[in-house]
C-alpha cells in the first residue's frame, strides 16, 4: 500500500466504516523524522474494526485543510488527525479544522484533555477540536504518541456509535416536506 493509499474492497469487510489518518507535521513531511503517531492511530482504528487509509503526512496549515476536505469528499466516516494542536507558532491544525467543521462536538476534545491531564499536566495545552463535516466525524489528536494513546482510549467506546448516529442510526433522519402538500 502506498502512503495514504487504499486497498480495494477492504472497507466492505469492516461494516463499511472507513477512516482516514492525517499527520500534521512540518518536520515529518520534510523527512526530518519518522511519523510515529499516524501509524499508531491507524493500528488503533483497525483494532476498532475500521478500514483505514493513511497516514497521510502533510505539513501543518493549508495542506491539513486540503486533506480534510478531500477526505470529506471521499466519504470517510472518520478522519483522525495527529499533530499541530499545541501552542507553537506553527501549530495550525485546530484553525484549519474549524474552517471545515459544520457542527462542533466539544465533549470529545474535553474528554481527551481530561484523560491526558491525569498523567501529563501539559495535556491541557492541546487545542484539538472535534466535530462533523458532511457525514464525516473529524477529531484532532495531539502529536505525541502518549497523546495519541490517550485519544484512542477516549475514542474507542465512542467512534462506532458516533458514526452510526451521524448516519441516522437509532434516530430517524428528518423527512423533507413534500412540496405538493
Go through each PLM region and give its residues.
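Non-catalytic beta/alpha edge segments that cap or flank active sites
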Residues: 1-181
Amino acid at each position: 500500500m502506498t502512503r495514504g493509499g487504499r486497498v480495494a474492497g477492504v472497507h466492505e469487510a469492516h461494516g463499511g466504516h472507513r477512516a482516514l489518518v492525517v499527520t500534521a507535521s512540518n518536520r515529518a513531511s520534510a523527512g526530518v523524522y519518522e511519523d510515529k503517531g499516524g501509524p499508531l492511530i491507524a493500528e488503533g482504528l483497525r483494532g476498532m474494526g475500521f478500514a483505514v487509509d493513511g497516514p497521510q503526512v502533510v505539513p501543518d496549515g493549508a495542506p491539513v485543510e486540503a486533506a480534510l476536505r478531500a477526505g470529506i469528499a471521499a466519504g470517510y466516516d472518520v478522519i483522525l488527525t495527529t499533530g499541530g494542536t499545541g501552542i507553537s507558532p506553527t501549530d495550525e491544525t485546530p484553525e484549519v479544522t474549524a474552517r471545515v467543521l459544520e457542527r462542533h462536538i466539544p465533549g470529545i476534545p474535553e474528554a481527551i484533555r481530561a484523560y491526558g491531564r491525569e498523567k501529563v499536566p501539559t495535556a491541557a495545552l492541546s487545542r484539538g477540536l472535534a466535530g462533523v463535516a458532511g457525514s464525516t466525524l473529524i477529531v484532532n489528536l495531539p502529536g505525541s504518541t502518549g497523546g495519541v494513546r490517550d485519544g484512542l482510549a477516549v475514542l474507542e467506546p465512542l467512534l462506532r456509535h458516533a458514526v452510526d448516529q451521524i448516519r441516522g442510526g437509532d434516530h430517524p433522519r428528518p423527512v423533507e416536506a413534500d412540496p405538493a402538500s
